[in-house]
Amino acid sequence: MNPSRRSPLTWAVHLSVLLLVLLWTLPTAGLLISSLRDKDQLAVSGWWTALSSSSRNAVVRAPSAEDQVERDGKFVISGNLLEGRGEVSAFGFSSREPTKFKPGETAELNDGERLTVQSDGSFEIVSDQRMEGSRGQRIFFTATTPPRFTLDNYAEVLSAAGIGRSFLNSLTVAVPSTVIPILIAAFAAYALAWMPFPGRAVLLAVVVGLLVVPLQMSLIPLLQLYNGVGAFFGVSAKTYMGIWLAHTGFGLPLAIYLLRNYMAGLPREIMESARVDGASDFDIFVKIILPLSFPALASFAIFQFLWTWNDLLVAIVFLGAGDDKLVLTGRLVNLLGSRGGNWEILTASAFITIVVPLIVFFALQRYLVRGLLAGSVKGG
C-alpha cells in the first residue's frame, strides 16, 4: 500500500476536525464582527450581513413649531432624518402607511401643511400659515445604510465608571483562587499516588464523588458557615479571603483527581532511586514530582483561571455587589441594563473580558494536551 495515499477513515477524521474547528471559530468571529458594528445596524441584521447595506424602519419626531422659520412667505420646519448616514427609500406620516411616499414626493398633512423628504434624509414641512403646537410631526421612514464599523462600542465600555477597579478586583480574585488550590492539590495528589496509607482508596473515591456535586447546592450552606465564622471572630464574611477559600473548595476535587492521575503515571524507578540516595518524601515531591508534573499543573491552572475569571455567581454571593468589590463580570452586567438589549455593549464586553484568559491560555496551551492525557491509562 502506498503510504502517501490516505485511507477514507483518515479523510473522515480530518474533515470532522475541520468541522469542529469551524463550529468553534464561527461564533467567535461573529462576536468580533458584531462588536465592531454600528449599534443601529447590529439591531436590524446579523453579523453575516456586515459587509452589505442594511435596511431599517424608524420614526423621528420633527422639531416643534417653535423652530419654524419664515422663507419666501412660507413657514418652514427643516431637518435631517439620517444625520448624514444612509439613504431614505420611503417615508410616511402615519404608522398605518409608513412607506406610502417615495423620496422627493410631497405628502399632504393636516391644516394644509406639506411634508417633503429627500433621499439623503433632509426634510421640510411647509405651511402657508404659521404652524401651531408644542409637539413636532412624526415622520416614519425606511432607510438603507452602508456597512459601518466603529470602535465606539469598546470606547463606551472602557470609559464606563469603575471598569478599571473591577478589572483589578477580578485579578485579585482569580490569581490567588488559582494558585491556592494548585498548591494544596499537589500535596494531596502526591500522597494519593505514592504514599500508601489506610483508607487511601476510600479517600480517592470521595474526591471523585465530589466532582459531581453541583456548585449551586453548596453556595448557601457555605455562606451561612462563613457568616457564622465571621460573626464569631467579629469580621465580615464577604472578603477576598472568603471567596479565595470558596473557589479553592470548589476547585480542589478536579485538581486532586487530575494531578493524582498524572503523578501516578510517572516512572516509579525515579522515586525509588531517590529514596535509595536518602531523599525524603518532601525532597522527592519538590525536586522530582513538581518539575515533572508541570504540564498537569498548567492544565489545571488554565481551567481554574478561566472559571474564576468568568465567574459571577460565586463572586456575588461571597464578595458582594458593592462598587469597591464588584468584579468585571458584575460591572459588565450592570452596563447591559435590566433588559439586556444592548447588544453592542454585550459583544464588546465579551471581547474585553477574554483578553486576559486568552493570554493565559496561549502561554500555557502547549502543556494542556500533555497534562490531560498523560497518566490517563497507566495508574498508580
Swiss-Prot record:
Location (main, coarse): membrane
GO cellular component, one term: plasma membrane
Gene Ontology biological process: transmembrane transport
Record-annotated ABC transmembrane type-1 domain positions: 167-364
Entry keyword annotation includes Isomerase: no
Keyword Transmembrane in record: yes
Function recorded in the entry: Part of the binding-protein-dependent transport system for alpha-glucosides such as sucrose, maltose and trehalose. Probably responsible for the translocation of the substrate across the membrane.
Stated name of the protein: Alpha-glucoside transport system permease protein AglG
Gene field: aglG
